[in-house]
UniProtKB/Swiss-Prot annotation:
<dbReference type="GO" id="GO:0009037">
    <property type="term" value="F:tyrosine-based site-specific recombinase activity"/>
</dbReference>
<comment type="function">
    <text>Site-specific tyrosine recombinase, which acts by catalyzing the cutting and rejoining of the recombining DNA molecules. The XerC-XerD complex is essential to convert dimers of the bacterial chromosome into monomers to permit their segregation at cell division. It also contributes to the segregational stability of plasmids.</text>
</comment>
<dbReference type="InterPro" id="IPR011010">
    <property type="entry name" value="DNA_brk_join_enz"/>
</dbReference>
<keyword id="KW-0229">DNA integration</keyword>
<feature type="active site">
    <location>
        <position position="259"/>
    </location>
</feature>
<dbReference type="GO" id="GO:0005737">
    <property type="term" value="C:cytoplasm"/>
</dbReference>
<dbReference type="GO" id="GO:0051301">
    <property type="term" value="P:cell division"/>
</dbReference>
<feature type="active site">
    <location>
        <position position="236"/>
    </location>
</feature>
<protein>
    <recommendedName>
        <fullName>Tyrosine recombinase XerC</fullName>
    </recommendedName>
</protein>
<feature type="active site" description="O-(3'-phospho-DNA)-tyrosine intermediate">
    <location>
        <position position="268"/>
    </location>
</feature>
<feature type="active site">
    <location>
        <position position="142"/>
    </location>
</feature>
<keyword id="KW-0238">DNA-binding</keyword>
<keyword id="KW-0131">Cell cycle</keyword>
<feature type="domain" description="Tyr recombinase">
    <location>
        <begin position="102"/>
        <end position="281"/>
    </location>
</feature>
<keyword id="KW-0159">Chromosome partition</keyword>
<keyword id="KW-0963">Cytoplasm</keyword>
<keyword id="KW-0233">DNA recombination</keyword>
Length: 299
């Protein structure tokens, strides 16, 4: 191993990096050393690094892997520069090829309706499942947000849901009529764990876990013919896709989803909630009306 590489790895070890991290740095920098052939990696130029990246890319290395290797090289040269062993960092101005953006998978409107409408059965768990998946699609919930919901997060009088999203940020989202109906049915049959604050419970009366929700949806998707690769986040993607198709209001959908940024270059844009509710009511396929029954049960 080159002396400079060895000292860099020792520096990382003293800094408390894990053995796994040390091995990754060593492999990434030794890879570059081997690609440089007669020249030491410590003396590489920006052009040579760019050529090395291009060669790895041509060999089929993923964008994620290229980015990791470039990051290792950049840290190595930064350390050399800080120690006075190089005047520049040849990796500082280089960027790995952008990662291929995988489009989120969403069900079509009729496919979503077919799945939700075919979740049948008379048991308490069936009622719970109908409520969960209607609510996920109605409000564009993340799985983590779904299982974190408590009973008092549902405002039955105004058909609103309080959601605790990423970073502890809360948002209010309208609940569609179909989801409200399913929620009331579920709460009417929710017999176990009455002292449990969680909105959705498992068989033993405790808060339902994310993996249980994933398995239940996968089982229902197979049973109803929707396919075996349906997962809760697909319902969130479907919510976003269908709302955009119907309303074209990207900023409103951003608010409803709880995204901090409209895009990588745009800051968070807050909208008036009344506008959000108007967009929601007019656009969501299963929220044509949000009724307020006189005999509301807020328990």
């Amino acid at each position: 191993m080159d002396e400079a590489i060895r000292r860099f790895i020792e520096h990382l070890a003293v800094a408390g990096r894990s053995p796994h991290t040390l091995a990754a740095y060593r492999a990434d920098i030794e890879l570059l050393e081997n690609m440089m052939q007669a020249k030491s990696a410590r003396d590489a130029t920006a052009a040579e690094l760019r050529k090395a990246l291009a060669k790895l890319h041509a060999q089929g290395l993923s964008s994620r892997s290229l980015a990791r290797r470039l990051s290792s090289w950049r840290q190595f040269y930064h350390w050399l520069q800080r120690n006075g062993e190089r005047e520049d960092n040849p990796a500082a101005g280089l960027y790995a090829p952008k990662r291929d953006k995988l489009l989120p998978k969403a069900l079509p409107v009729d496919g979503t309706a077919a799945l939700l409408d075919r979740i049948e059965g008379e048991s308490e768990l069936d009622a719970r499942d109908r409520a969960i998946f209607e609510l996920v699609y109605s409000c564009g919930l993340r799985l983590s947000e779904t299982v974190a919901l408590n009973l008092d997060d549902v405002d039955f009088s105004d058909s609103l849901l309080r959601i605790r999203g990423k970073g502890g940020k809360e948002r209010l989202v309208p609940i569609g009529a179909e989801a409200m109906l399913r929620l009331r049915t579920w709460l009417g049959e929710r017999s176990a764990g009455m002292d449990e604050p969680a909105l959705f419970l498992g068989r033993h009366g405790h808060r339902l876990g994310g993996r249980q929700v994933e398995k239940r949806l996968r089982d229902w998707a197979i049973k109803t013919g929707a396919g075996q690769h349906v997962h809760p986040h697909m319902l969130r993607h479907s919510f976003a896709s269908h709302m955009l198709q119907s309303s074209g209001d990207l900023r409103a959908v951003q608010e409803l989803l709880g995204h901090a940024n409209l895009s990588s270059t745009q800051i968070y844009t807050a909208l008036d909630f009344q506008h959000l509710a108007k967009v929601y009511d007019g656009a969501h396929p299963r929220a044509r009306k949000r009724g307020k029954p006189d005999d509301e049960n807020k328990s």
